[in-house]
Design a protein with these regions (language model features):
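Conserved catalytic network of the ASCE P-loop NTPase/AAA+ motor domain
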Residues: 8, 32-36, 58-59, 82-85, ...
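Conserved helicase motor
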Residues: 20-24, 45-48, 65-78, 94-98
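Short, charged, surface-exposed secondary-structure boundary motifs
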Residues: 23-30, 73-79, 118-124
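Conserved strand-helix element at the start of the C-terminal RecA-like helicase core
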Residues: 2-3, 34-60, 64-68
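Post-DEXD/H (motif II) to motif III coupling segment of the RecA-like Helicase ATP-binding lobe
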Residues: 1-22
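Conserved segment of the helicase C-terminal RecA-like domain
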Residues: 2-3, 7, 86, 90, ...
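Conserved two-lobed SF2 helicase motor
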Residues: 42, 83-102
């Protein structure tokens, strides 16, 4: 849906195929980082915040892989493999995980719902939140998303849209 208007302007004869999510996505609210379950991703929107959260997890829980768009493909792939192989139980990432990286995640927690877009700091729109939150649970495995740290709560209306995949 987020790209439909743009694609329609570029190409007239396009067929859209909508595939239903086969698993349930639920909102789990706020959790302290120390209480976040294994097989979780914590999403941040600056390298400084990603590294700070990863260090906190390392001290409290033993380690985390890091995925950011600024990493080289080789480094990013090795970090994904570190997580996927079970060497670490947590992933700290930017919104880069929302674009073509499928991982075995049960939970996604946002440390922030604002990002710098190259011009200004702005709130994520619902489709951006949904693209990232939907990394939790895949195929037939249910997943959940929530917030952590100082992140402001997601409104009940937004939660309903996200849980029902209307974004």
């Amino acid at each position: 849906n987020s790209m439909k208007n743009i694609i329609d302007k570029l190409e007239e004869d396009v067929e859209y195929i909508h595939r239903k999510r086969l698993s349930k996505l639920t909102y789990s609210g706020h959790k302290k980082i120390s209480r976040i379950e294994r097989k979780s991703a914590i999403i941040a929107f600056s390298a400084e915040e990603v590294y700070a959260i990863a260090e906190l997890i390392r001290r409290q829980k033993g380690g985390a892989a890091i995925v950011m768009g600024s990493l080289s493909p080789k480094t990013r792939n090795s970090q994904v493999e570190l997580y996927q192989s079970g060497d670490v139980d947590f992933l700290v990432a930017t919104d880069a995980i929302g674009m073509g990286i499928n991982m075995d995640l049960d939970y996604v927690y946002f440390s922030n719902l604002k990002k710098f877009d190259g011009k200004k700091l702005r709130k994520l729109n619902l489709s951006e939140i949904g693209q990232i939150a939907c990394r939790a649970g895949r195929y037939l495995n249910d997943g959940s998303f929530g917030i952590t740290g100082e992140c402001k709560d997601i409104s009940p209306d937004e939660v309903e849209h996200l849980e029902n995949h209307k974004f």
